[in-house]
Structure formats: C-alpha cells, structure tokens
C-alpha cells in the first residue's frame, strides 16, 4: 500500500507542469479525469481554465476523509460526473458529495465491433488447434489477482467435479496468483479438469465454444468480460458482488447470480445449470441485448448527450 502511495505522489509531481502546460497552451474544450484524478482536480481548483472538467468515477471507491473532502470541495469546479453503473450513481447521490444535476450514468465502452469481427474470424491454425483441443468446458477470464477470487472458483469447481467427474474449467489469464492457483489445482488432483492458459490475446474463439462464463469476483464495475461473453452469446454465471454484474444480469433475469464468496453457492449454480442448460436461451438473449449498450458507438452517443446537455 505504501509503495503504491509513493508511486502515486511521484506521478503527480512529474506530471504537474506538463499537464498544466497542456491546459494553458492547448486549451482543450473538455478533459475527462479518470483513475489518477487528484492532479487534474487540484489544477482545476488552483487555476482558471477554459476547459470543462469531467470526473469519471469507476469501481467502488472508498470514501475516506481525504477523497470525500477533495470531491466535495471541488464539486463546484467540475462540469459533469459520470458513473459506469446505476448502483454507483445511486450510492454517490446518497452521499451528497456532488450536485445531483451534474451526475450521470454512462456505460463503459467495451465492445469494439471492428475488433470483434477481426478476432472472431481468427484464422491462425496453431491458435485454432489450441481452441479445438478443449471441449464442453466452462470458462473464466481475467487477471489472476485477489479481486477475481480464483481460489474460491477453483474450490467450488472441485466440489462440482464430485458430481460431474468429466467437468472442464479453462481459466485464461496471467497475474501474481498463478503459481498459488496452479499448486491449489495440483494438490486437489484436478490437473486433468482445470487448466490455466496464459498468453492468450484473443478470447472470443474460446467464448464462442464454451458452455458458460463464470465470474467469481469480489468486486467489479460492470465486468468487461461478462459483457464480451454475452456479446458472444455465451451464458453468464456471476457472483452478486458490488457493483455491476447483478445490474447487467438484471438480478438474475439475464444470467445466473450466486452469493459472492459463499461456500457451495457456485457449486449449486453449476449443478442447476447442468440440469437445465438447454433451456436458457431467453436469459442469453436478454444478456446479448444488454451487451449491445456497451459498444464504442453507444458510449459515444451517450457521452455526447451528456457533454452537450442533451439529457
């Protein structure tokens, strides 16, 4: 934690004058502040610019004293505030930090249609042979980090294997937990059923062939991977973690939700899915329809309306 705070301060110090120069010299009409937001907020408070500042709040921010103080005292200088989920928007409105009429829901830009078409038509034989080497599998995609909660996913799938001994789980991702997860799989004698695949830049062919995507995260925004999966007509099984999955899956009307990180909850959902797998098209269609709201074009249209006060 301390090292990340120090890195954050170093970035601010080295970026202060370059960003100030851009704002004074180039005078952009808008600037969207996202992730590393303290510096542009600080500059906006210290100087008068022609530029309109838009704050993008993602994830599920911890409202510590510093952040709450900074946001509340900067609100009058911020043009608009956008959030990627309606739950987060509602939460921030209740906290009464920003002026309500400045706050908007703005879905993430996740699906690039041109990129999707290119990747779905992948013709590299070595890669396609790798995809074809797996069959009738569940899929999980994302960095191998604490947030994604892979130890829970693996443990629950191992329980599922007691009922369905031929079950297959592919985990596509890289990260600091890879060795620990590999050892967890080995210790439970599940190396013939659970596979971790790294260095995969194109997940769409895997999504097109999978039975369902599983997301076990402890927290997410909407969860980019569930949007991509739904766009590929893949059924989604997700934890009900804050903040976005249950919103995207319409509280279980467009996919399966299970109680986040609760023992046996995912196992039960996998059992249920196996029993009724052929009868879930209505839920998949709803999720597919929802995913179309997250294209770059839809994001562009929504952002344009917000910036031009057309909402």
Language-model features: locations:
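Conserved acidic donor-binding segment of nucleotide-sugar-dependent glycosyltransferases
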Residues: 250-252, 256-263, 271-277
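Aromatic "clamp/platform" in nucleotide-sugar-dependent glycosyltransferases that forms part
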Residues: 199, 218
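A short, well-ordered alpha-helix in the C-terminal region of glycosyltransferases
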Residues: 265, 279-293
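A short, active-site helix/loop in glycosyltransferases that binds the activated sugar's phosphate group
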Residues: 78-105, 110-117
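A conserved, positively charged/aromatic
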Residues: 6-7, 53-82, 97-98
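Short hydrophobic beta-strand element within catalytic cores of glycosyltransferases
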Residues: 235-239
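A conserved mid-protein helix/loop that constitutes part of the nucleotide-sugar donor-binding site
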Residues: 136-159, 167, 176-183
């Amino acid at each position: 934690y301390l090292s990340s705070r120090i890195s954050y301060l170093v970035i601010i110090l080295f970026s202060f004058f370059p960003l100030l120069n851009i704002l004074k010299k180039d005078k952009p009409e808008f600037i969207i502040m996202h992730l590393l937001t303290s510096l542009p907020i600080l500059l906006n408070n210290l100087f008068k610019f022609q530029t309109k500042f838009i704050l993008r709040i993602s994830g599920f921010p911890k409202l510590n004293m510093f952040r709450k103080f900074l946001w509340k005292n900067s609100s009058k200088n911020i043009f608009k505030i956008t959030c990627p989920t309606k739950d987060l928007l509602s939460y921030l409105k209740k906290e009464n930090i920003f002026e309500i009429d400045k706050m908007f829901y703005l879905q993430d830009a996740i699906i690039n249609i041109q990129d999707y078409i290119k990747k779905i038509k992948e013709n590299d034989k070595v890669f396609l042979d790798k995809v074809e080497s797996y069959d009738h599998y569940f899929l999980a995609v994302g960095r191998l980090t604490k947030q994604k909660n892979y130890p829970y996913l693996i443990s629950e799938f191992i329980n599922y294997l007691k009922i369905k001994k031929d079950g297959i789980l592919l985990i596509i991702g890289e990260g600091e937990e890879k060795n620990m997860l590999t050892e967890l799989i080995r210790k439970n004698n599940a190396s013939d059923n659970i596979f971790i695949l790294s260095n995969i830049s194109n997940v769409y062919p895997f999504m097109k062939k999978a039975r369902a995507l599983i997301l076990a995260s402890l927290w997410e925004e909407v969860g980019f991977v569930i949007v991509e999966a739904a766009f590929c007509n893949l059924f989604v099984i997700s934890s009900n973690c804050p903040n976005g999955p249950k919103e995207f899956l319409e509280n279980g009307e467009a996919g399966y939700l299970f109680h986040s990180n609760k023992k046996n909850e995912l196992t039960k959902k996998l059992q249920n899915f196996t029993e009724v797998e052929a009868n879930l098209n209505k839920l998949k269609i709803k999720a597919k329809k929802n995913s179309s709201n997250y294209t770059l074009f839809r994001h562009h249209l929504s952002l344009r309306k917000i910036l031009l006060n057309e909402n």
